[in-house]
């Protein structure tokens, strides 16, 4: 990005604004609270407390045009091979809508629709049985997305199925889950793109044995033959996924099977509708009015121009408590790259460390560091305008904290006692959902997906591969025999010492 024609101008704006006080920016642009706000369907965004002004934003958008961001969106939606290292499309948008006239995208949408109807039929069959509980086994993209959505949208009571998620290879996770269940009234779903994932195979074997066979086992995989063979699952209970959908973008596919069981098939379709509506906004809205573009460019500004190494996400709705963990994978696995599309080294820092938690709990853990620490941490505050629980006073208090914390972080407060002084200058974006509905959550997740893509285009990196996860897995498979007592040549001296400790 530093090699673009507009970078010097952008850098000059950063030098000008780096030490600017956020109240001064608001005073200089009196209409800023509304001019820097956007409403897209059920989502409201306010960027007024970010440390840029109109001139800096214009410079950011100039680089986005130089990087052909609009063309990049067209290539994504039309199913071109934007995943250049694996020579694949990234057609997660086609799982939820048919928004272009590109044949490859339309065919992908039709294929996804057919599989979704198959999934609906399987749900109807399960509803006709005595099954009350579902154990969903997967990891990474096969777990984080479904777990987030199921937890966020499940009814407080009265759901037809209770869905339990197991991801970690640690046997304690499976033991604790199965201890509360009756195998005669439980079904299992094994989700793995390749069906070669160690965690899923080991946990799947435990579940298969506990259920007493494969009669109530289902699978979702891009390798359905291997899935069926590994656990003797009838082909009719195996749903496909595809190599043109990355795991962290796959909750909209049959990977969402446990979501549909947890919240109902109709509400699962509403989730997809909300995402598709936001997709349409991204595809059809000029860059300057495009919320995903503004969110992504804000992240680039904070990372590359203001030097922020981390980004916090605070969800002021307990039902969204798992969103920070989901976004960690979406953002950091997509953008944790050090080389550009052509294999040359990047010319600027890429992804920040994303982290966070649920408010107001986080105010009593790490907010001390946000307010008075030496690092400035940009943040997203996410809340809901309307709650649907009967405790209105609690929701009012929750939203008061959103308003108070974002104001305090931005404005600070002077004191004659330095221990009680707040420097301010901490930027944040506020995102408000009208209510936590399937449509709103679908739109919110879609926004973050597209924000990630914006950042990848600005940095010239591939958001859709993840080779960085492979080396550790390869080494683990080589070391496993050594932990079982076999003779293995281990070159690393520290690993040898640790092996000796583990083997006693």
UniProtKB/Swiss-Prot annotation:
PANTHER family reported in the protein's UniProt record: GLUCOSE-6-PHOSPHATE ISOMERASE
Presence of the UniProt keyword Isomerase in the record: yes
Name assigned to this protein: Glucose-6-phosphate isomerase
Gene Ontology biological process: gluconeogenesis; glucose 6-phosphate metabolic process; glycolytic process
Location of the active site: 333 (proton donor), 364, 473
Disulfide pattern: none
Family as reported in the entry's similarity comment: Belongs to the GPI family.
Protein role: Catalyzes the reversible isomerization of glucose-6-phosphate to fructose-6-phosphate.
Domain of life of the organism encoding this protein: Bacteria
Additional observations: Mutation in pgi results in the inability of X.c.citri to utilize fructose or glycerol as carbon sources, to grow in plant tissue, and to cause typical canker symptoms.
Principal place of residence: cytoplasm
CDD domains in the record: SIS_PGI_1, SIS_PGI_2
């Amino acid at each position: 990005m530093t090699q673009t024609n507009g970078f010097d101008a952008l850098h000059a704006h950063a030098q000008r604004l780096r030490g600017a006080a956020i109240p001064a920016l608001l005073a200089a642009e009196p209409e800023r609270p509304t001019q820097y706000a956007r409403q897209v369907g059920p989502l409201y965004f306010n960027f007024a407390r970010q440390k840029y002004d109109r001139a800096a934003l214009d410079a950011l958008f100039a680089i986005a045009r130089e990087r052909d961001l609009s063309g990049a969106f067209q290539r994504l939606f039309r199913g071109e091979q934007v995943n250049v290292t694996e020579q694949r499309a990234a057609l997660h948008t086609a799982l939820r809508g048919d928004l272009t006239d590109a044949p490859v995208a339309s065919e992908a949408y039709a294929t996804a629709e057919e599989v979704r109807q198959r999934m609906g039929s399987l749900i109807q069959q399960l509803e006709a049985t005595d099954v009350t509980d579902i154990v969903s086994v997967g990891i990474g993209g096969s777990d984080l997305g479904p777990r987030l959505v199921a937890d966020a949208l499940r009814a407080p009571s009265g759901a037809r199925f209770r869905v339990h998620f197991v991801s970690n290879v640690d046997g304690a996770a499976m033991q604790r889950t199965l201890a509360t269940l009756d195998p005669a009234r439980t079904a299992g779903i094994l989700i793995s793109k390749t069906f070669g994932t160690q965690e899923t195979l080991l946990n799947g074997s435990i579940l298969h044995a506990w259920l007493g066979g494969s009669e109530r086992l289902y699978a979702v995989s891009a390798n359905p033959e291997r899935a069926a063979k590994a656990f003797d699952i009838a082909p009719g209970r195996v749903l496909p996924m595809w190599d043109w959908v990355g795991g962290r973008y796959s909750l909209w596919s049959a990977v969402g099977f446990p979501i549909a069981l947890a919240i109902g098939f109709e509400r699962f379709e509403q989730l997809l509708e909300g995402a598709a509506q936001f997709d349409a906004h991204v595809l059809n809205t000029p860059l300057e009015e495009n919320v995903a573009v503004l969110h992504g460019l804000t992240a680039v500004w904070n990372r590359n121009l203001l030097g922020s190494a981390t980004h916090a996400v605070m969800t002021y709705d307990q039902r969204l408590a798992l969103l920070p963990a989901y976004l960690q994978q979406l953002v950091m696995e997509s953008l944790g790259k050090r080389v550009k599309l052509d294999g040359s080294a990047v010319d600027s820092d890429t992804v920040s460390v994303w982290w966070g938690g649920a408010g107001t709990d986080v105010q009593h853990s790490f907010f001390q560091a946000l307010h008075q620490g030496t690092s400035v941490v940009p943040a997203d505050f996410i809340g809901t305008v309307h709650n649907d629980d009967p405790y209105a006073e609690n929701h009012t208090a929750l939203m008061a904290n959103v308003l108070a914390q974002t104001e305090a972080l931005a404005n600070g407060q002077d004191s004659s006692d330095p221990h009680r002084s707040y420097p301010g200058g901490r930027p944040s974006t506020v995102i408000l959902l009208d209510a936590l509905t399937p449509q709103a959550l679908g739109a919110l997740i879609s926004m973050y997906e597209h924000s990630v893509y914006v950042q990848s285009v600005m940095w010239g990196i591939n958001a859709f591969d993840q080779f960085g996860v492979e080396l550790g897995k390869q080494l683990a498979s080589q070391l496993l025999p050594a932990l079982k007592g076999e003779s293995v040549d281990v070159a690393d001296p520290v690993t040898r010492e640790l092996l000796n400790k583990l083997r006693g």
